[in-house]
């Protein structure tokens, strides 16, 4: 503390050379010890004033602090977590169980800790657009782990409309032969005469029409298939026309029409028509023997 020694030696009239060798400078031998004692006392007072006085009540885990937590709700949170304003001002939170001033000089303010991504201060410092989901149609930025191919979902495939399956023709397929009207009439006349031609007949007939034997053979095959389809259609029409049509009044009757019941009904109708004062026309009766089978039997076959 050289500056302090110079400041105290000037008012007391002590020279630097004399004080270095311990010789008094014209003031007597009794003034040097008193000046040194005063200087030491002043230095001790300055050091004591510079050291922070740590009271046991300020420690977070002292008995007084724990007792004060039970008395005052919310005191524990305020003692453990420093306020955001203190951190913003440059003050650093001391570790638990370590007195303040033991980690460094009390006068030099320590640098604030960097805020983590998931700490309370870090979440409060985030911008609003990071906390609120963006409503813009732009694609949000992805984190690095989402951009890796292992975690990113596969891109959506665009479903293309199914291609229309067309009939595949042979590459060596010959074009269809355009028959003339005279050729078609001659082929039809020959088909009506004979549906199957021998090899000699086919060769002679094809040469007369200026056609190949293969063309005549294929035409006869197609014509026979067409004739078969027409014949089956005619048979189906005949079967539909041959089905009997039942009268609507005969549903639910199990006795044969034209039997004794029909005769009795006809007799009763004739008597009923002649008995009254006014002549009434008799109801027409179905001829006897028209339907000889049971009605129920016919209905069974219709269903």
Curated annotation (Swiss-Prot):
<dbReference type="GO" id="GO:0005667">
    <property type="term" value="C:transcription regulator complex"/>
</dbReference>
<feature type="compositionally biased region" description="Basic and acidic residues">
    <location>
        <begin position="133"/>
        <end position="142"/>
    </location>
</feature>
<dbReference type="GO" id="GO:0035115">
    <property type="term" value="P:embryonic forelimb morphogenesis"/>
</dbReference>
<dbReference type="GO" id="GO:0071316">
    <property type="term" value="P:cellular response to nicotine"/>
</dbReference>
<dbReference type="GO" id="GO:0010463">
    <property type="term" value="P:mesenchymal cell proliferation"/>
</dbReference>
<comment type="similarity">
    <text>Belongs to the Msh homeobox family.</text>
</comment>
<feature type="cross-link" description="Glycyl lysine isopeptide (Lys-Gly) (interchain with G-Cter in SUMO)">
    <location>
        <position position="15"/>
    </location>
</feature>
<feature type="compositionally biased region" description="Low complexity">
    <location>
        <begin position="31"/>
        <end position="44"/>
    </location>
</feature>
<dbReference type="GO" id="GO:0035116">
    <property type="term" value="P:embryonic hindlimb morphogenesis"/>
</dbReference>
<keyword id="KW-0805">Transcription regulation</keyword>
<dbReference type="GO" id="GO:0051154">
    <property type="term" value="P:negative regulation of striated muscle cell differentiation"/>
</dbReference>
<feature type="cross-link" description="Glycyl lysine isopeptide (Lys-Gly) (interchain with G-Cter in SUMO)">
    <location>
        <position position="133"/>
    </location>
</feature>
<dbReference type="GO" id="GO:0042474">
    <property type="term" value="P:middle ear morphogenesis"/>
</dbReference>
<dbReference type="GO" id="GO:0000977">
    <property type="term" value="F:RNA polymerase II transcription regulatory region sequence-specific DNA binding"/>
</dbReference>
<dbReference type="Pfam" id="PF00046">
    <property type="entry name" value="Homeodomain"/>
</dbReference>
<dbReference type="GO" id="GO:0042482">
    <property type="term" value="P:positive regulation of odontogenesis"/>
</dbReference>
<dbReference type="GO" id="GO:0030901">
    <property type="term" value="P:midbrain development"/>
</dbReference>
<dbReference type="GO" id="GO:0007517">
    <property type="term" value="P:muscle organ development"/>
</dbReference>
<dbReference type="GO" id="GO:0061311">
    <property type="term" value="P:cell surface receptor signaling pathway involved in heart development"/>
</dbReference>
<keyword id="KW-1017">Isopeptide bond</keyword>
<dbReference type="GO" id="GO:0042475">
    <property type="term" value="P:odontogenesis of dentin-containing tooth"/>
</dbReference>
<dbReference type="GO" id="GO:0002039">
    <property type="term" value="F:p53 binding"/>
</dbReference>
<dbReference type="GO" id="GO:0009952">
    <property type="term" value="P:anterior/posterior pattern specification"/>
</dbReference>
<dbReference type="InterPro" id="IPR017970">
    <property type="entry name" value="Homeobox_CS"/>
</dbReference>
<dbReference type="GO" id="GO:0000902">
    <property type="term" value="P:cell morphogenesis"/>
</dbReference>
<keyword id="KW-0539">Nucleus</keyword>
<dbReference type="GO" id="GO:0034504">
    <property type="term" value="P:protein localization to nucleus"/>
</dbReference>
<feature type="region of interest" description="Disordered">
    <location>
        <begin position="133"/>
        <end position="174"/>
    </location>
</feature>
<dbReference type="InterPro" id="IPR050674">
    <property type="entry name" value="Msh_Homeobox_Regulators"/>
</dbReference>
<feature type="DNA-binding region" description="Homeobox">
    <location>
        <begin position="172"/>
        <end position="231"/>
    </location>
</feature>
<dbReference type="GO" id="GO:0048863">
    <property type="term" value="P:stem cell differentiation"/>
</dbReference>
<dbReference type="GO" id="GO:0050821">
    <property type="term" value="P:protein stabilization"/>
</dbReference>
<keyword id="KW-0038">Ectodermal dysplasia</keyword>
<keyword id="KW-0217">Developmental protein</keyword>
<keyword id="KW-0678">Repressor</keyword>
<dbReference type="GO" id="GO:0060021">
    <property type="term" value="P:roof of mouth development"/>
</dbReference>
<dbReference type="GO" id="GO:0097152">
    <property type="term" value="P:mesenchymal cell apoptotic process"/>
</dbReference>
<dbReference type="GO" id="GO:0000987">
    <property type="term" value="F:cis-regulatory region sequence-specific DNA binding"/>
</dbReference>
<dbReference type="GO" id="GO:1990837">
    <property type="term" value="F:sequence-specific double-stranded DNA binding"/>
</dbReference>
<dbReference type="GO" id="GO:0060349">
    <property type="term" value="P:bone morphogenesis"/>
</dbReference>
<keyword id="KW-0804">Transcription</keyword>
<keyword id="KW-0371">Homeobox</keyword>
């Amino acid at each position: 503390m050289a500056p302090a020694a110079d400041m105290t030696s000037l008012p007391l009239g002590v020279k630097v050379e004399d004080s270095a060798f311990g010789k008094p400078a014209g003031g007597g031998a009794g003034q040097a010890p008193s000046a040194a004692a005063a200087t030491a006392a002043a230095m001790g007072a300055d050091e004591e004033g510079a050291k922070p006085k740590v009271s046991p009540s300020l420690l977070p885990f002292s008995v007084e602090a724990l007792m004060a937590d039970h008395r005052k709700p919310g005191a524990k949170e305020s003692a453990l977590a420093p306020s955001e304003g203190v951190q913003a001002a440059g003050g650093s939170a001391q570790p638990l169980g370590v007195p303040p001033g033991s980690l460094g000089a009390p006068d030099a303010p320590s640098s604030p800790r960097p805020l983590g991504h998931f700490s309370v201060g870090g979440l409060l410092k985030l911008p609003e657009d990071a906390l609120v989901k963006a409503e813009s149609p732009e694609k949000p930025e992805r984190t690095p782990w989402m951009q890796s191919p292992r975690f990113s979902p596969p891109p959506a495939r665009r479903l293309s409309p199914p291609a229309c399956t067309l009939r595949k023709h042979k590459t060596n397929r010959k074009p269809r032969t355009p028959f003339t009207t005279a050729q078609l009439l001659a082929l039809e006349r020959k088909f009506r005469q004979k549906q199957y031609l021998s090899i000699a007949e086919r060769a002679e007939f094809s040469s007369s029409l200026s056609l190949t034997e293969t063309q005549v053979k294929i035409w006869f095959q197609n014509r026979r298939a067409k004739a078969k389809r027409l014949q089956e259609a005619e048979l189906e029409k005949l079967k539909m026309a041959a089905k009997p049509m039942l009268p609507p009044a005969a549903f639910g009757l199990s006795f044969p029409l034209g039997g004794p019941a029909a005769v009795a009904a006809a007799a009763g109708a004739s008597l009923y028509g002649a008995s009254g004062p006014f002549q009434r026309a008799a109801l027409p009766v179905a001829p006897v023997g028209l339907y000889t089978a049971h009605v129920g039997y016919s209905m069974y076959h219709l269903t």
